From Swiss-Prot:
NCBIfam families: D_ala_D_alaTIGR, PRK01372.1. Its main location: cytoplasm. Binds 2 magnesium or manganese ions per subunit. Pfam families: Dala_Dala_lig_C, Dala_Dala_lig_N. InterPro entries: ATP-grasp, D-Ala_lig_Van_CS, D_ala_D_ala, Dala_Dala_lig_C, Dala_Dala_lig_N, PreATP-grasp_dom_sf. Cell wall formation. This is D-alanine--D-alanine ligase. Its EC number is 6.3.2.4. One of its GO terms (molecular function) is metal ion binding. Its cofactor is Mg(2+); Mn(2+). Residues 104-301 form the ATP-grasp domain. Mg(2+) 1 binds at D255, E268. It comes from the Bacteria.
Length: 308
């Protein structure tokens, strides 16, 4: 890229301390390699190994930190304080997007469809949860991504083990009504929705979990997604409203379901999605003509807004 010098010195933020560190290292290395191939002066920067105050030596930052510390507004706040432009969503939108309950509350308040849920505490009567949500349910840590700590619960006697698994990752746990149907993901670039992708994990996988996302090679990705043109546009419009409602910006991803009656349900938002070989944003942008290198440069272009 002939004018790559306009970016100056770029820190590719990767790794970190969250449960998603390994994925972030893979994503970050892929982004770093793409930027270097594009002529950008980019360097890896792992906040686990270096003080974030060293970021003053860079002109801008490409955030590829997944999970806590990188996707929850913390590193965004540091970069704001240091007056360093960065990719993706700002402090508030990142903090909201990392909190599944806050996200749902905002969507509900915006009259957007999201699956019913209950916050689980030690005092929660699990029978009342089953009465309200039915079975199966999915148990989730509220502040983790990449499906870390999630479990599908089909029998009441399995509740306790699923909650114990989730609490290993987060003090706050939620139960969400299980939506039977087709799973879709909608990626965003420059704040606009990309072609919808249908996710079809193999039959032995209960849902699109961590292993399916990053380790298995038998997940099917449907592009085109199998929806009619009208339905796809409806889902894209719904997800754009949801993306904007939580304050997400630039690039990201929203996961959704279509139930057996044809209704769409929003699951969650990802403000720093994966950028590995298995990842969904690169698959969506490839469908509209972007190479991976072009995608990375396009995301970085966002940091020039108002500074060029």
């Amino acid at each position: 890229m002939s004018n790559a010098t306009k970016f100056g010195k770029v820190a590719v933020l990767l790794g970190g301390k969250s449960a998603e560190r390994a994925v972030s290292l893979d994503s970050g290395q892929a982004v770093l390699d793409a930027l270097l191939r594009s002529g950008v002066q980019a360097e890896a920067f792992d906040p686990q190994d270096r003080s974030v105050t060293e970021l003053v030596n860079y002109d801008r930052a490409f955030i590829v930190l997944h999970g806590r510390g990188g996707e929850d507004g913390q590193i965004q706040g540091v970069l704001e304080w240091l007056n360093i432009p960065y990719t993706g969503t700002g402090v508030q939108g990142s903090a909201i997007g990392m909190d599944k309950v806050k996200t749902k509350q905002i969507w509900q308040g915006s009259d957007l469809p999201t699956a019913p849920y209950r916050i689980i505490t030690k005092e929660t009567d699990l029978d009342s949860v089953i009465a309200e949500l039915g079975l199966p349910v999915i148990i989730k840590p509220v502040h983790e991504g990449s499906s870390v700590g999630m479990s599908k619960v089909e029998k009441a006697e399995d509740f306790a083990a699923a909650i114990e698994k989730a609490t290993q990752h987060d003090a706050v746990v939620m139960a969400e009504k299980w939506i039977t149907g087709r799973e879709f993901t909608i990626s965003f670039l420059n704040g606009q929705p990309l072609p919808v992708i249908r996710l079809q994990p193999p039959a032995d996988v209960a849902f699109y979990d961590y292993e399916a996302k990053y380790q298995r090679n038998d997940v099917e990705y449907g592009i085109p997604c199998g929806l009619s043109e009208t339905e796809e546009k409806k889902l894209q419009a719904l997800c754009l409203r949801a993306f904007q409602a939580v304050g997400a910006e630039g690039w990201g991803r929203i996961d959704a379901m279509q139930d057996e009656q044809g209704n769409f349900w929003l699951l969650e938002v990802n403000t720093v999605p994966g950028m590995t070989s298995h990842s969904l944003v690169p698959k969506a942008t490839k469908a509209v003509g972007y190479s991976f290198d072009e995608l990375c440069v396009a995301i970085l272009e966002q940091t020039l807004e108002g500074t060029a």
